[in-house]
From Swiss-Prot:
The gene is fsa6. GO terms for molecular function: DNA binding; DNA-binding transcription factor activity, RNA polymerase II-specific; zinc ion binding. PROSITE patterns: ZN2_CY6_FUNGAL_1 (PS00463), ZN2_CY6_FUNGAL_2 (PS50048). It is found in: Nucleus. Disruption phenotype: Fairly reduces the production of fusarisetin A. Disulfide bonds: none annotated. This is Fusarisetin A cluster transcription factor fsa6. Residues 107-116 have a biased composition (Polar residues). The lineage of its organism: Eukaryota, Fungi, Dikarya, Ascomycota, Pezizomycotina.
Length: 751
């Protein structure tokens, strides 16, 4: 008994022990009971009544953010309830947006009654355009029209891992997001739940201009000079650049550059690092042009070896450019800084299959440097500038303004250079041989009928001036009268009519004697014109106004014309065709216009078939649009392997055209079988000599004119095309966005 009494031990007390002697569980152990309170109340340690939304969140006006942990693992039945709740939240958001629209209109009307805002001084030379403030001046009795009729008209905001990406309502991605608005909200919730799990994303690979991230490997001048090829190679690259790139006369004076080029080879060590960076940009662009001349269909060892060698040269030259800029302290400005940055941006554009936000930011830095160096003020205001320097400053500034507008439109953001900030006159139409650094007095400008290398840049700059005002109007958050839209439309038509005959597009049949570069110049002038038409009238397509039918007609006609140009470029950039060697010119900037046209036609079909009041022109016209979209689908499919943007449009088109079983972007070889169409298509209507482009927009569609198109049945077939490989722009991930749209019951489903 004594031995047994000794075996009975008293209950142990102490740290980590319970009164019963069991080990105390660590406080860090997760609770096994389910979380019943909402996430916000749990985080704030508040009492939660477990309602949807709970009273605590409702009192703090956080009802839309009141979520529960159990929402992540819902069954099918409860998932339907969550979707219903999400729809209620969307309706609530729409009501808030509508209230904000009403308040905004009331505030604008109140401001108009006080008085008109005086227009800023310093208007540039050119047509008399109204300033954004002058649009709201009470010069007429017409009330401003609020064109925003849906949340999508405020632009599109996409949340991505580290932040948010915004594009304006005139951007093609915002147009598509307006179609898939519900799915976008669901995707945002899914991404929010994924982020809340605390999974760190992998380190992203740095893309785009390396200059924004600092030189990964700083280099001295000796190392930079050692990477320059032999002079025979550099001579060929410089020649290729000046003979291929139409932007070269607007940035560099060929005669002056040759003098500096010879001085470099005489004594490379005394050459400034910035000029070396300029030389590397020229070689980088020229090497890209040479690489694009290789036939992608030939896979012989010699061709593959040449392709690898050229790509290595491009990578080396691309690395040296930011090293030279940093070594030369480019942020302080100075000679050749703007020229190097502009060509560097051009090289990055051609290298990217998707639009890079870094390129737009680098363009902003270039604009700031140009302002710092006074390029926005005309040289006549300053003494000490030679006639040669003054003319080159005008050329460079005109190109900067054009690049700013083009990249801003591609990103769907307001441009950085405003017309009231500058008074720099346009450059003269002169050959490089007409003046040099020794010129005392500049010769008179040549006539517009004289097709000089700089004429295209001048004509495009004039057209882009008008388009710039239109882009400013589209980015203006204030409403303005529809009469202002009509005025801008008239000015745009006049700007197009002022294009010299030598740069006007008629048809491919009338351009067979032109150089490929000349043909592309004409096409680009046409595409930017029709893009501006869409941007100007898009918001008024479905407004309850008498003018909405006119705007809808202009938008649809412009979109169809843009896709017709896309189809023509697809055909003419094939082997043995006229533009095959110049296919590199179809860059992401050019494709942006085709993306906008594709998206706007999808947007129209959704409204035409889904609206309670029919807004469709006709059933046959809708079939024409779908035929054109089918052909564009095949074209986008070819570039979907290398472009996120193309994948997004391909999936959107698959839904809009009612093809749920569309193959993935990897099935590029099956492009001709996607819609049951043959692999070859009739030629584009843009190639037809009889299909002329009208001088202006008439009251009827050109394709409905019996004189131009007597056989309507054959016209629908003419809008079907084959694929091409083109770089496109990068936007937010939407690989899954359109997938869920396939489950919706689309009224125009063709199956």
């Amino acid at each position: 008994m004594a031995d047994q009494a000794q075996d009975v031990r008293p209950t142990e007390w102490g740290p980590g022990k319970t009164p019963q002697g069991r080990a105390r569980l660590p406080s860090s152990r997760p609770r096994e009971k389910p979380q019943l309170s909402c996430n916000l109340c749990r985080r704030r340690k508040l009492r939660c009544d477990r309602q949807r939304p709970c009273s605590s969140c409702a009192q703090r006006e956080l009802g839309l953010s009141c979520t529960y942990a159990s929402d992540r693992v819902l069954s099918n039945g409860v998932a339907h309830q969550t979707r219903t709740t999400t729809q209620d939240r969307i309706r609530h958001l729409e009501s808030l947006v509508y209230d904000l629209m009403q308040n905004s209109s009331a505030n604008v009307n109140a401001q108009d009654q006080v008085g008109a805002t005086p227009s800023p001084r310093g208007q540039p030379r050119g047509p008399d355009y109204p300033t954004p403030a002058a649009v709201h001046a009470p010069s007429t009795n017409e009330e401003p029209v609020s064109a925003a009729v849906s949340p999508a008209d405020y632009g599109s905001m996409q949340s991505t891992g580290g932040g948010a990406n915004y594009v304006g309502s005139a951007h093609w991605a915002a147009v598509l997001d307006g179609i898939a608005e519900l799915k976008d909200h669901l995707d945002n919730e899914e991404s929010h739940h994924s982020d809340s799990q605390g999974v760190d994303p992998p380190c992203p690979q740095v893309t785009g201009p390396q200059l924004l991230y600092g030189c990964p490997k700083p280099a001295d001048k000796d190392e930079i000079l050692s990477s320059i090829p032999a002079r025979s190679v550099v001579d060929r690259l410089v020649s290729r650049y000046f003979n291929s790139f139409e932007m070269s006369p607007a940035v560099l004076h060929s005669v002056q550059f040759l003098k500096e080029y010879e001085a470099f080879w005489e004594d490379p060590q005394t050459t400034s690092p910035i000029w070396l960076g300029l030389l590397f940009t020229i070689m980088c662009l020229a090497t890209q042009f040479e690489k694009s001349r290789l036939d992608p269909g030939v896979q012989s060892p010699a061709v593959l070896s040449m392709e690898r060698e050229l790509q290595e040269m491009v990578d080396t030259f691309r690395l040296r450019i930011p090293q030279c800029l940093v070594l030369g302290s480019y942020a302080k400005g100075g000679p050749f800084v703007l020229e190097t940055l502009m060509l560097y941006i051009a090289a990055e554009i051609f290298l990217s299959s998707d639009a890079e936000i870094e390129i737009w930011i680098l363009m902003g830095n270039t604009v700031q440097l140009a302002l710092h160096m006074g390029y926005h003020r005309d040289p006549k205001h300053f003494k000490g500038l030679s006639p040669f320097a003054a003319e080159m400053r005008r050329r460079i500034w005109a190109t900067i303004v054009e690049m700013d507008l083009g990249l801003s439109a591609q990103m769907g953001l307001p441009r950085m250079v405003k017309h009231w900030q500058t008074d720099t006159q346009e450059p003269s139409n002169l050959q490089d041989s007409d003046f040099d650094s020794a010129t005392v007095e500049m010769p008179p400008s040549r006539l517009n009928t004289d097709l000089t290398p700089i004429l295209y840049r001048l004509v495009k700059a004039r057209l882009m001036t008008t388009i710039g005002y239109i882009w400013d109007f589209s980015a203006d958050v204030r409403p303005y009268p529809y009469t202002e839209v009509q005025k801008m439309d008239d000015k745009l038509d006049l700007a197009r009519k002022s294009i010299p005959e030598c740069l006007k597009w008629h048809s491919m049949a009338r351009n067979i004697t032109d150089s490929p570069q000349h043909i592309m110049q004409k096409v680009i002038l046409e595409t930017v014109f029709y893009r501006a038409k869409i941007v100007l009238h898009r918001k008024y397509m479905f407004l309850p106004l008498a003018q909405s039918a006119s705007s809808r007609r202009i938008v649809l006609e412009s979109a169809l014309k843009l896709l017709d140009y896309q189809h023509m470029l697809q055909e003419e950039t094939q082997p043995f065709c006229q533009l095959y060697q110049e296919r590199w010119r179809v860059s992401s900037l050019v494709n942006h216009d085709f993306l906008l046209a594709t998206s706007i036609l999808c947007y129209y079909l959704q409204h035409a078939w889904g609206a309670t009041q029919r807004v469709s022109e006709s059933d046959s016209f809708d079939e024409t649009i779908m035929a054109s979209l089918r052909r564009s689908h095949d074209i986008w499919l070819q570039s979907s392997n290398s472009s996120k943007e193309a994948r997004k449009v391909v999936r959107a088109l698959a839904v809009v055209l009612g093809r749920v079983n569309t193959p993935s972007a990897d099935s590029v070889g099956e492009a001709g079988l996607v819609f049951g169409l043959p692999s070859t298509y009739p030629p584009s209507t843009t190639n037809d000599y009889s299909q002329e482009t009208p001088g202006g927009l008439g009251s009827q569609f050109p394709m409905f004119n019996s004189a131009l198109m007597p056989n309507w049945a054959t016209f629908a077939d003419d809008l079907i095309s084959a694929p091409m490989i083109t770089p496109t722009a990068e936007w937010q991930e939407m690989d899954e966005t359109v997938d869920a749209m396939g489950s919706l019951n689309w009224p125009w489903n063709l199956q």
